[in-house]
Amino acid sequence: MFMINLLMMIVPILLAVAFLTLVERKVLGYMQLRKGPNVVGPYGLLQPIADAIKLFTKEPLRPLTSSISMFIMAPILALTLALTMWTPLPMPYPLINMNLGILFMLAMSSLAVYSILWSGWASNSKYALIGALRAVAQTISYEVTLAIILLSVLLLSGSFTLPTLITTQEHIWLIVPSWPLAMMWFISTLAETNRAPFDLTEGESELVSGFNVEYAGGPFALFFLAEYANIIMMNIFTTILFLGAFHNPLMPELYTINFVTKSMLLTISFLWVRASYPRFRYDQLMHLLWKNFLPLTLALCMWHVTMPIITAGVPPLT
C-alpha cells in the first residue's frame, strides 16, 4: 500500500514538473511578445512529452577523463533528494507524518549540495567545477537565512511538525505579522533553487552552462527534473509557512484546491521574476546575504523570541 501511495505522489510531481517547463517557456514567450512553443500538439501542449522523448533517447555521452560512478550518481542523487523532500508536506495529509518535518526538509536541502559538488568535480572540466563551487557557496550561504527564518516561524507555531502550521494559521496568515521574514524567505528561496536573478551557476557568458555542462540526454534530464521539482516544492513550503490554507477535516479537497492555487501563483511569480530581472553580480549576491539578510533575520528572530515572553504577562482584553 505504501508503494502505491509513493507512486501516487511521485507521478503527479513529475507531471507537474514536465508542464512547468512548458508554462515557463510560454510565460517567457508572452513577456517577450512572442508565442512560445506552439507546434507540438494543440497550443504546444505536448511539448514536454516531445522533450522527454528527445532527451531520454539520446546517447548518454561521458567525458573520457570523468570519474564514471560519481558522474552517474550525481543526477540520480539530485532527483532522489528532490523527491524525498516532498514526503512530509501536508497536502492536507502528508505521505509520512514526521515529528520533525521542518528539520527533515532543511537536512535534505543541505544534502542536495553534494549532488552539485559531485557533478562538477566528476565532470573533470574547469567550467563545471567553477559552476559547482559557485552553486555550493550560494546554496550553503542562503540556507543560513532560511534556517533562521524557519526558526522565527517555529517560535510562532510552537512545533517542528508541518501540520501544526495549518492550525496556527486558522485565524490569520503568518505573512501578516511577519511580512519582512516572508519577503526575505521568498528571495532566499529564489537563491536556494538557483533561479534568476541568482542563477550565477549557469552564467552562459562566462561558464557555458554551469555544473551540468558535460551532461547530455538522460542524466541532464534528471538534473532538470530535480531543479524544477525543487522550485515547486519550495513554493509549496512557502505556502504552508506563510499562506496557510484553511483545513476542514470534513472536506479536505477544499484545502487542496486552495493550497495548490496559492502554490501555482507563487511558482508563476518565480517565472515572472526570471523574465523581469537581470542577473546579480557574484559579490552583490553574497553581500545581500551576509551584510543585509543575516543581520535582519537575526534581529527579527530575537524579536520573535522576546515578543511572546513580553506579552505573556498581559491579561486578556476580552
Curated annotation (Swiss-Prot):
PROSITE patterns: COMPLEX1_ND1_1 (PS00667), COMPLEX1_ND1_2 (PS00668). Its main location: mitochondrion. The chain crosses the membrane at residues 2-22, 68-88, 100-120, 146-166, 171-191, 222-242, 253-273, 293-313. It comes from the Eukaryota. Disulfide bonds: none annotated. It catalyses: a ubiquinone + NADH + 5 H(+)(in) = a ubiquinol + NAD(+) + 4 H(+)(out). It is found in: Mitochondrion inner membrane. One of its GO terms (biological process) is mitochondrial electron transport, NADH to ubiquinone. GO terms for molecular function: NADH dehydrogenase (ubiquinone) activity. It holds the Pfam family NADHdh. GO terms for cellular component: mitochondrial inner membrane. Keywords: Electron transport, Membrane, Mitochondrion, Mitochondrion inner membrane, NAD, Respiratory chain, Translocase, Transmembrane, Transmembrane helix, Transport, Ubiquinone. It is a multi-pass membrane protein. Its EC number is 7.1.1.2. Core subunit of respiratory chain NADH dehydrogenase (Complex I) which is composed of 45 different subunits. Belongs to the complex I subunit 1 family. Core subunit of the mitochondrial membrane respiratory chain NADH dehydrogenase (Complex I) which catalyzes electron transfer from NADH through the respiratory chain, using ubiquinone as an electron acceptor. Essential for the catalytic activity and assembly of complex I. This is NADH-ubiquinone oxidoreductase chain 1.
